[in-house]
Amino acid sequence: MAAHTHAASGVELWPLALMWFGMMAAMMAPAAWPWVRDFHRFSGISGSDGVEATARFASGYLLAWLGYAIGAALLQRGFQQSALMPASGDRLVAGAGAVIFLLAGLYQFAPLKRACLTHCRTPIGYFLTRWRNGPMGGFRMGLHHGLFCIGCCWALMATAFAVGVMNVWWMAALAAIALAEQIAPHGDRLRRILGGVFLVAGLLLMI
């Protein structure tokens, strides 16, 4: 019986991971587009070869987010099994949601967040200093950038556990925030403002 239950849980995990991957791909597409565009231009490769090279860059980027999606799915299953999230729901209980917001708020002020955001704001600088040639060069650069992107946005995306994993409006807001942090002239100020907002939200949920 235990083995059967474990197997069933494993079957359910992958649709959940694919759901998270689809959400991450959709939400990060606006922020990823400037990088994909600049990679294609900077590569200087035209025609079908250029499309193929750009596709490898995008594939590396998506692979990084697939890893995040699997981790998020495992975390959601853990929340459901520990009763921190109702099995039929998509949002953490208030106390756990408060912890998520507090962690996300604190991370907005972390040096790692600032470093990853600086990377995400300078695609041309990255390509000038870290360019890799060869068939797998684009893929490796895409994967590398994807890891930086996760370092910048993982806590933002984790707030979905507190608001609602299937909350379309919150997902749209997160996509807009991720893009604004990257391209807005005062993106670093926005980072700090969001940190304060998340901390206040976490404290309010604890009351």
List PLM regions with ranges.
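Juxtamembrane boundary at the C-terminal end of a transmembrane helix
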Residues: 201-207
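Juxtamembrane transmembrane-helix termini in multi-pass membrane transport proteins
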Residues: 16-62, 66
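Interfacial segments of multi-pass membrane proteins
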Residues: 41-46, 137, 155-167, 176-182
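Membrane helix-loop-helix hairpins that form the core translocation module of multi-pass transporters
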Residues: 1, 16-17, 51-112
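Histidine-/acidic- and/or cysteine-rich, low-complexity loops and terminal segments associated
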Residues: 1-22, 43-48, 80-90, 110-132, ...
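Alpha-helical membrane-inserting segments
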Residues: 26, 30, 63, 67-79, ...
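Alpha-helical transmembrane segments of helical membrane proteins, especially in multi-pass transport
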Residues: 107-115, 137-165
